[in-house]
Amino acid sequence: EKHGIEVKHELPGVGENLQDHFMVAVQHGVNRGVTLGCDGQFPRVVLNVFKYLFTKRGPLAFPAANVGVFFKGEGDTRPSFQIHFTPGAGDMDEHGNTAPADQPGVNSTTCLLRPESRGHVHIRSTDPKSPPAIQYNYLSTEYDRRRTVEGVKWQRKIYAAKPFQEIATTEIKLGAHVQTDEQILDYCRKEGSSVYHPIGTCKMGAASDPMAVVDNELRVHGLHALRVVDASIFPYLISGNTHAPTVAVAEKAADLIL
Protein backbone atom coordinates (compact mmCIF):
# COMPACT_ATOMS: atom_id res chain seq x y z
CA GLU A 1 0.00 0.00 0.00
CA LYS A 2 2.82 2.45 0.74
CA HIS A 3 3.73 2.29 -2.96
CA GLY A 4 0.17 2.97 -4.08
CA ILE A 5 -0.60 -0.63 -5.02
CA GLU A 6 -4.07 -1.94 -4.19
CA VAL A 7 -3.90 -4.98 -1.92
CA LYS A 8 -6.05 -7.86 -3.20
CA HIS A 9 -4.93 -10.47 -0.67
CA GLU A 10 -2.70 -9.98 2.35
CA LEU A 11 -0.14 -12.56 3.45
CA PRO A 12 2.40 -11.00 5.84
CA GLY A 13 4.91 -13.79 5.21
CA VAL A 14 5.50 -12.84 1.57
CA GLY A 15 9.05 -11.56 1.24
CA GLU A 16 9.98 -12.46 4.82
CA ASN A 17 12.02 -15.39 6.22
CA LEU A 18 14.88 -14.83 3.74
CA GLN A 19 17.78 -17.20 4.46
CA ASP A 20 21.10 -17.78 2.73
CA HIS A 21 24.45 -19.45 3.23
CA PHE A 22 27.11 -16.88 4.15
CA MET A 23 30.65 -17.82 3.13
CA VAL A 24 33.99 -16.57 4.41
CA ALA A 25 37.26 -17.18 2.57
CA VAL A 26 40.71 -18.05 3.85
CA GLN A 27 43.54 -17.80 1.31
CA HIS A 28 47.08 -19.09 1.61
CA GLY A 29 50.13 -18.63 -0.56
CA VAL A 30 52.02 -21.66 -1.89
CA ASN A 31 55.62 -21.98 -3.02
CA ARG A 32 55.24 -24.50 -5.82
CA GLY A 33 52.74 -25.88 -8.27
CA VAL A 34 50.54 -24.13 -10.83
CA THR A 35 47.40 -22.49 -9.44
CA LEU A 36 44.37 -21.07 -11.22
CA GLY A 37 45.81 -17.61 -10.64
CA CYS A 38 48.82 -18.56 -12.73
CA ASP A 39 46.63 -20.19 -15.38
CA GLY A 40 44.51 -17.05 -15.64
CA GLN A 41 47.40 -14.77 -16.54
CA PHE A 42 49.03 -14.09 -19.90
CA PRO A 43 50.36 -16.06 -21.75
CA ARG A 44 49.04 -19.20 -19.98
CA VAL A 45 45.42 -18.06 -20.27
CA VAL A 46 45.69 -18.00 -24.09
CA LEU A 47 47.23 -21.46 -24.17
CA ASN A 48 44.52 -22.79 -21.86
CA VAL A 49 41.75 -21.40 -24.09
CA PHE A 50 43.15 -23.26 -27.11
CA LYS A 51 43.77 -26.37 -25.00
CA TYR A 52 40.11 -26.46 -24.06
CA LEU A 53 38.88 -25.71 -27.59
CA PHE A 54 40.85 -28.57 -29.13
CA THR A 55 41.10 -31.15 -26.33
CA LYS A 56 38.37 -30.22 -23.82
CA ARG A 57 41.03 -30.46 -21.11
CA GLY A 58 42.85 -28.08 -18.81
CA PRO A 59 41.67 -25.61 -16.15
CA LEU A 60 38.66 -24.51 -18.22
CA ALA A 61 37.33 -28.08 -18.12
CA PHE A 62 36.82 -28.32 -14.38
CA PRO A 63 34.84 -26.25 -11.85
CA ALA A 64 36.45 -23.56 -9.75
CA ALA A 65 35.65 -25.43 -6.52
CA ASN A 66 37.40 -28.79 -6.87
CA VAL A 67 36.85 -30.13 -3.36
CA GLY A 68 33.84 -29.98 -1.05
CA VAL A 69 33.74 -31.02 2.60
CA PHE A 70 30.91 -31.32 5.12
CA PHE A 71 32.16 -31.44 8.71
CA LYS A 72 31.06 -31.27 12.32
CA GLY A 73 32.07 -28.48 14.64
CA GLU A 74 32.22 -28.25 18.41
CA GLY A 75 29.51 -30.43 20.00
CA ASP A 76 27.81 -31.28 16.70
CA THR A 77 26.09 -34.60 16.01
CA ARG A 78 25.80 -33.84 12.29
CA PRO A 79 27.74 -31.59 9.92
CA SER A 80 27.22 -27.89 10.53
CA PHE A 81 29.74 -26.54 8.03
CA GLN A 82 30.56 -26.86 4.35
CA ILE A 83 33.95 -26.04 2.84
CA HIS A 84 34.73 -25.43 -0.82
CA PHE A 85 38.37 -25.54 -1.93
CA THR A 86 39.84 -23.86 -5.02
CA PRO A 87 43.47 -24.15 -6.23
CA GLY A 88 43.72 -20.41 -6.76
CA ALA A 89 43.54 -17.13 -4.87
CA GLY A 90 42.12 -13.75 -5.82
CA ASP A 91 39.77 -10.90 -5.01
CA MET A 92 36.18 -10.30 -6.11
CA ASP A 93 34.88 -6.81 -6.81
CA GLU A 94 31.36 -5.48 -6.19
CA HIS A 95 30.27 -6.72 -9.62
CA GLY A 96 31.33 -10.32 -8.98
CA ASN A 97 34.42 -10.17 -11.19
CA THR A 98 37.46 -12.04 -9.85
CA ALA A 99 41.05 -10.90 -10.33
CA PRO A 100 43.91 -13.33 -9.54
CA ALA A 101 46.10 -12.61 -6.53
CA ASP A 102 49.60 -11.31 -7.23
CA GLN A 103 51.11 -14.57 -5.95
CA PRO A 104 50.38 -18.32 -6.32
CA GLY A 105 47.86 -19.40 -3.72
CA VAL A 106 44.82 -21.47 -2.78
CA ASN A 107 41.42 -20.51 -1.47
CA SER A 108 38.83 -22.16 0.77
CA THR A 109 35.45 -20.89 1.90
CA THR A 110 33.29 -22.10 4.76
CA CYS A 111 29.62 -21.54 5.46
CA LEU A 112 27.33 -22.36 8.36
CA LEU A 113 24.75 -24.80 6.99
CA ARG A 114 21.80 -23.91 9.24
CA PRO A 115 22.05 -20.22 10.14
CA GLU A 116 19.52 -18.52 12.39
CA SER A 117 19.66 -15.10 10.72
CA ARG A 118 16.55 -14.04 8.80
CA GLY A 119 16.11 -11.25 6.28
CA HIS A 120 13.55 -10.03 3.78
CA VAL A 121 12.88 -8.99 0.17
CA HIS A 122 10.59 -6.00 -0.43
CA ILE A 123 9.61 -4.02 -3.51
CA ARG A 124 10.87 -0.44 -3.85
CA SER A 125 8.26 0.99 -6.21
CA THR A 126 5.48 0.18 -8.68
CA ASP A 127 8.06 -0.38 -11.43
CA PRO A 128 8.42 -4.17 -11.91
CA LYS A 129 11.88 -3.59 -13.42
CA SER A 130 13.12 -1.77 -10.34
CA PRO A 131 15.53 -3.91 -8.25
CA PRO A 132 13.94 -5.06 -4.98
CA ALA A 133 15.28 -4.16 -1.56
CA ILE A 134 17.12 -7.27 -0.36
CA GLN A 135 18.24 -7.44 3.27
CA TYR A 136 19.90 -10.70 4.31
CA ASN A 137 20.77 -9.69 7.89
CA TYR A 138 23.83 -11.94 7.87
CA LEU A 139 25.41 -12.59 11.29
CA SER A 140 22.46 -11.01 13.09
CA THR A 141 22.36 -13.66 15.84
CA GLU A 142 24.95 -14.61 18.45
CA TYR A 143 24.81 -18.22 17.24
CA ASP A 144 25.64 -17.30 13.65
CA ARG A 145 28.50 -15.04 14.70
CA ARG A 146 30.04 -17.63 17.02
CA ARG A 147 29.71 -20.55 14.60
CA THR A 148 31.01 -18.56 11.60
CA VAL A 149 34.15 -17.63 13.54
CA GLU A 150 34.48 -21.32 14.44
CA GLY A 151 34.30 -22.26 10.76
CA VAL A 152 37.11 -19.86 9.91
CA LYS A 153 39.26 -21.35 12.66
CA TRP A 154 38.68 -24.84 11.22
CA GLN A 155 39.99 -23.66 7.87
CA ARG A 156 43.12 -22.38 9.54
CA LYS A 157 43.59 -25.75 11.24
CA ILE A 158 43.53 -27.44 7.83
CA TYR A 159 46.17 -25.08 6.47
CA ALA A 160 48.28 -25.64 9.59
CA ALA A 161 48.48 -29.40 8.92
CA LYS A 162 51.95 -30.73 8.12
CA PRO A 163 51.27 -31.80 4.48
CA PHE A 164 50.13 -28.31 3.56
CA GLN A 165 52.84 -26.55 5.54
CA GLU A 166 55.41 -28.18 3.26
CA ILE A 167 54.23 -25.93 0.41
CA ALA A 168 52.78 -23.01 2.39
CA THR A 169 54.09 -19.46 2.40
CA THR A 170 52.07 -16.64 3.98
CA GLU A 171 48.37 -16.38 4.78
CA ILE A 172 46.92 -13.97 2.22
CA LYS A 173 43.51 -13.78 3.89
CA LEU A 174 42.71 -13.31 6.79
CA GLY A 175 46.30 -12.26 7.40
CA ALA A 176 48.57 -13.11 10.31
CA HIS A 177 47.47 -9.97 12.18
CA VAL A 178 43.89 -11.30 12.50
CA GLN A 179 43.93 -13.54 15.60
CA THR A 180 41.23 -12.82 18.18
CA ASP A 181 37.59 -13.84 17.78
CA GLU A 182 36.65 -10.17 17.55
CA GLN A 183 39.17 -9.59 14.75
CA ILE A 184 37.98 -12.68 12.88
CA LEU A 185 34.35 -11.58 13.19
CA ASP A 186 35.24 -8.13 11.90
CA TYR A 187 36.97 -9.77 8.92
CA CYS A 188 33.87 -11.91 8.29
CA ARG A 189 31.65 -8.84 8.23
CA LYS A 190 33.92 -7.05 5.77
CA GLU A 191 34.88 -9.95 3.49
CA GLY A 192 32.01 -12.46 3.74
CA SER A 193 29.61 -12.96 0.85
CA SER A 194 26.69 -15.02 -0.41
CA VAL A 195 26.93 -18.65 -1.55
CA TYR A 196 23.89 -17.81 -3.72
CA HIS A 197 21.47 -20.12 -1.89
CA PRO A 198 18.61 -17.70 -1.05
CA ILE A 199 15.38 -19.38 0.05
CA GLY A 200 12.32 -19.02 2.26
CA THR A 201 10.42 -15.88 1.26
CA CYS A 202 7.19 -17.78 0.43
CA LYS A 203 7.56 -20.50 3.00
CA MET A 204 5.41 -23.62 3.19
CA GLY A 205 3.34 -24.07 6.34
CA ALA A 206 -0.07 -24.68 7.84
CA ALA A 207 -2.82 -22.10 7.38
CA SER A 208 -2.63 -21.51 11.15
CA ASP A 209 0.91 -20.13 10.72
CA PRO A 210 0.51 -16.39 10.01
CA MET A 211 3.86 -16.30 8.18
CA ALA A 212 3.17 -19.29 5.91
CA VAL A 213 2.50 -18.50 2.24
CA VAL A 214 1.85 -21.89 0.58
CA ASP A 215 0.36 -25.20 1.72
CA ASN A 216 1.80 -28.69 1.25
CA GLU A 217 0.64 -28.71 -2.37
CA LEU A 218 2.35 -25.38 -3.11
CA ARG A 219 -0.99 -23.50 -3.27
CA VAL A 220 -1.00 -19.94 -1.96
CA HIS A 221 -3.14 -19.71 1.17
CA GLY A 222 -6.45 -18.01 0.53
CA LEU A 223 -6.17 -17.84 -3.26
CA HIS A 224 -7.48 -20.08 -6.03
CA ALA A 225 -5.30 -21.54 -8.82
CA LEU A 226 -2.03 -19.91 -7.74
CA ARG A 227 1.05 -21.93 -6.80
CA VAL A 228 4.63 -21.01 -6.00
CA VAL A 229 7.23 -23.42 -7.38
CA ASP A 230 10.79 -22.44 -6.49
CA ALA A 231 13.23 -22.35 -3.58
CA SER A 232 11.24 -19.65 -1.80
CA ILE A 233 8.84 -22.29 -0.44
CA PHE A 234 11.48 -23.91 1.79
CA PRO A 235 10.74 -23.02 5.44
CA TYR A 236 14.36 -23.67 6.42
CA LEU A 237 17.65 -23.55 4.57
CA ILE A 238 18.91 -26.78 3.02
CA SER A 239 22.01 -28.25 4.72
CA GLY A 240 23.90 -28.13 1.44
CA ASN A 241 23.39 -26.84 -2.09
CA THR A 242 19.86 -25.82 -3.07
CA HIS A 243 19.75 -26.79 -6.75
CA ALA A 244 18.74 -30.47 -6.47
CA PRO A 245 15.96 -29.89 -3.88
CA THR A 246 14.56 -27.10 -6.06
CA VAL A 247 14.45 -29.44 -9.05
CA ALA A 248 12.65 -31.97 -6.84
CA VAL A 249 10.06 -29.33 -5.90
CA ALA A 250 9.50 -28.58 -9.60
CA GLU A 251 9.06 -32.28 -10.39
CA LYS A 252 6.55 -32.65 -7.55
CA ALA A 253 4.69 -29.56 -8.73
CA ALA A 254 4.37 -31.05 -12.21
CA ASP A 255 2.77 -34.15 -10.68
CA LEU A 256 0.37 -32.02 -8.61
CA ILE A 257 -0.67 -29.85 -11.53
CA LEU A 258 -0.90 -32.51 -14.23
Which functions belong to the PLM regions below?
Residues 1-55, 59:
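Glycine-rich loop(s) and the adjacent beta-strand/alpha-helix scaffold that form part
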Residues 30-35, 47-245, 253-258:
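FAD-dependent oxidoreductase catalytic-site/capping-region signature
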